[in-house]
Swiss-Prot record:
<keyword id="KW-0689">Ribosomal protein</keyword>
<dbReference type="GO" id="GO:0006412">
    <property type="term" value="P:translation"/>
</dbReference>
<keyword id="KW-0699">rRNA-binding</keyword>
<keyword id="KW-0694">RNA-binding</keyword>
<keyword id="KW-0687">Ribonucleoprotein</keyword>
<dbReference type="InterPro" id="IPR001648">
    <property type="entry name" value="Ribosomal_bS18"/>
</dbReference>
<dbReference type="InterPro" id="IPR036870">
    <property type="entry name" value="Ribosomal_bS18_sf"/>
</dbReference>
<dbReference type="InterPro" id="IPR018275">
    <property type="entry name" value="Ribosomal_bS18_CS"/>
</dbReference>
<comment type="function">
    <text>Binds as a heterodimer with protein bS6 to the central domain of the 16S rRNA, where it helps stabilize the platform of the 30S subunit.</text>
</comment>
<dbReference type="GO" id="GO:0022627">
    <property type="term" value="C:cytosolic small ribosomal subunit"/>
</dbReference>
<dbReference type="GO" id="GO:0070181">
    <property type="term" value="F:small ribosomal subunit rRNA binding"/>
</dbReference>
<dbReference type="Pfam" id="PF01084">
    <property type="entry name" value="Ribosomal_S18"/>
</dbReference>
<comment type="subunit">
    <text>Part of the 30S ribosomal subunit. Forms a tight heterodimer with protein bS6.</text>
</comment>
<protein>
    <recommendedName>
        <fullName>Small ribosomal subunit protein bS18</fullName>
    </recommendedName>
</protein>
<comment type="similarity">
    <text>Belongs to the bacterial ribosomal protein bS18 family.</text>
</comment>
<dbReference type="GO" id="GO:0003735">
    <property type="term" value="F:structural constituent of ribosome"/>
</dbReference>
Amino acid sequence: MKRERGRRGRKRVCSFCVDKATSIDYKETSKLRKYVTERGKILPRRISGNCAHHQRMLTTAIKRSRNIALLPFSTEA
């Protein structure tokens, strides 16, 4: 059997590196919502296109924002 080759898309660029962001503020919910799915899950690096450093900062910012109820943990289904 022939093995199908996966299609690779264009490599995404880290939006925080482009803006030269030194920190990610947990109070900016509009920016954080772009990196959370409709179900409330944090988007992985391969989909969001962030570098490892900013992905870690983004994850902690989203978790902080959830803890003080600026972002929901999940949707009501």
